[in-house]
Regions:
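C-terminal motif of bacterial Sec signal peptides marking the signal peptidase cleavage site
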Residues: 21-24
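N-terminal pre-ligand scaffold of iron-sulfur
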Residues: 28-104, 117-118, 122, 137-152
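Short cysteine/histidine-rich metal-coordination sites, predominantly Zn2+-binding motifs
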Residues: 103-113, 123-136
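Alpha-helical transmembrane segments
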Residues: 15-19
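Alpha-helical protein-protein interaction elements
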Residues: 14, 31-33, 108, 131
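Bacterial N-terminal signal peptides that target proteins for export
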Residues: 2-13
Length: 152
């Protein structure tokens, strides 16, 4: 094989590989919730404080009202793992009825009586005519010693 043929093959393979890279890249738009702006915050929860006693048991939850739109719900899954969710119903703009109430592992919005699973954030009873429904807005919850740090 001549040097010219080998050179052309390498150039062709390089061009083919580059074209493959460009074509395999897709622009997926992350669908943001249009009703809830995302605030940046970091909030440590000291589990030794009495106001957070409900978080010491699996299935326990607390509402931290000074965070987010309508507060942040922190939920203890199994004693060692925590989830944090925005306490404002994600399927309409914040209003007087949009703060969700927690009962066991279900969060309910009193505006439309939407119910959300606190383990997944998913809407359990979507309306039949809805084109788009949003899950609860998730916040990070990280265990650090005797604290849980909730952040976004």
């Amino acid at each position: 094989m001549s040097d010219l043929t080998l050179f052309l093959k390498k150039k062709f393979l390089s061009a083919l590989f580059t074209a493959f890279l460009f074509l395999s890249c897709s622009s997926t738009d992350l669908e943001r919730n249009p009703y809830l702006a995302e605030y940046s915050f970091q909030f440590p929860i000291n589990l030794n404080l009495p106001e957070y006693n409900d978080l010491k048991l699996a299935g326990g939850s607390v509402l931290i009202s000074q965070l987010g739109h309508k507060g942040v719900i922190v939920y203890n899954i199994n004693g060692n793992t925590f989830l944090a969710w925005e306490a404002s119903c994600p399927n309409h703009a914040p209003s007087s009825c949009s703060q969700i109430q927690v009962s066991d592992f279900i969060a309910e919005c009193s505006c439309e009586e939407y119910q959300y699973n606190l383990l997944t954030g998913q809407l359990l009873n979507p309306p039949a005519d809805a084109e788009t429904v949003y899950p609860l807005l998730f916040y990070r919850a990280e265990v650090r010693g005797n604290s849980v740090v909730v952040s976004n």
